[in-house]
Amino acid sequence: MIIYGKQIVLYVLEKHQDLIEEIFLSKEIDSKLFSRFAKLNKKIHKVDNQKAQALAKGGNHQGLILKLSDYHYTPLKDIKNMNFILVLDGLTDVGNIGAIARTAYSLGVDGMIAADIKTISNSGTIRTSAGALLDLPFAIHPRSVDLASELIDAGFTLIGATMDG
């Protein structure tokens, strides 16, 4: 999984070094930051801007790109044991999911479930969440109706909101 951009790269360097597999730099960086990368004993690649743009799929990489180990979703059974969870029904936009994850994490939500989606961009969602999804348990469920039944059976009280009013 590729992530890019100064803020998320610094967050991963600070909190989740164990996830870093490779480092890609497309410009000169501060010597202190470079020494932090060097201490990880991971392969550091100096790449031109064209290669960096390809790795970041055109995103604003700011010269900093990391290859991380694969993201693993939290099993639903683990989230069902939590007290305060948030369910996102049918949301697919990585910017929206990331922003909601940041807010949920800061408000003390224990876990988050995305329901009624087929696929999600893990790297984009983690990047837009500013790393919150690396610390917030996150699961995916294929059907929101079935998920609601499972959560009620597990003792949850469901509260819903819709943008339709």
What kind of region is each of these model predictions?
Residues 1-77:
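N-terminal positively charged helical leader segments and presequences
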